[in-house]
Regions:
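N-terminal, Lys/Arg- and Ser/Thr-rich interaction peptides
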Residues: 1-12
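Intrinsic-disorder/low-complexity coil detector
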Residues: 5, 72-74, 87
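Compositionally biased, non-globular sequence tracts
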Residues: 9, 20, 80-81, 100
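Generic secondary-structure boundary/loop-capping signal
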Residues: 10-13, 86-88
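Phosphate-interacting basic helix/loop segments used at nucleotide- and nucleic-acid interfaces
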Residues: 21, 25-36
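Short, structured protein-protein interaction patches enriched in aromatics and acidic/basic residues
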Residues: 37-79
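Mixed-charge, glycine-accented linear interaction segment located at domain edges/termini
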Residues: 83-112
Length: 112
């Protein structure tokens, strides 16, 4: 694609699961980092994103399957949490991905 427009990563992460994914990731980072400091062991966070064409939807609609796995080390063992869900999204002209299509016009008058 010659006119590839990169996706706004911050907006994309915040759009996944209505913002719940971003909150879960923020929480996981704090928990795993704190546990790694306390135990002096390695903690791991894994984020997996799968993209597939949405069935029966418009031609630019996709489904983003998201999975967040956190492994926080404990003095004896580890604490594992896994969150997974799906979010319908839209591939805009140029390839950027967002929750809503960006080709629509402003519906309401913007007052400055």
């Amino acid at each position: 694609m010659t006119n590839l427009r990169p996706t706004d990563c911050e907006e994309f992460i915040n759009d996944i699961d209505g913002g719940a994914f971003a909150e879960q990731l923020s929480y996981a980072v704090s928990i795993v980092a704190s546990a790694a400091m306390e135990t002096q062991k390695v903690g791991v966070i894994t984020v997996q994103l799968k993209f597939s064409k949405s069935k029966g939807a418009g031609h630019n609609n996709i489904t983003v399957e998201h999975k967040l796995i956190s492994n926080a080390p404990l003095p004896k063992g580890k604490c594992v949490e896994e969150h997974r869900d799906k979010t319908p999204m839209y591939v805009n002209t140029g390839g950027d991905v967002s929750l809503f299509a960006k080709h629509t016009e402003q519906l309401f008058e913007v007052k400055a």
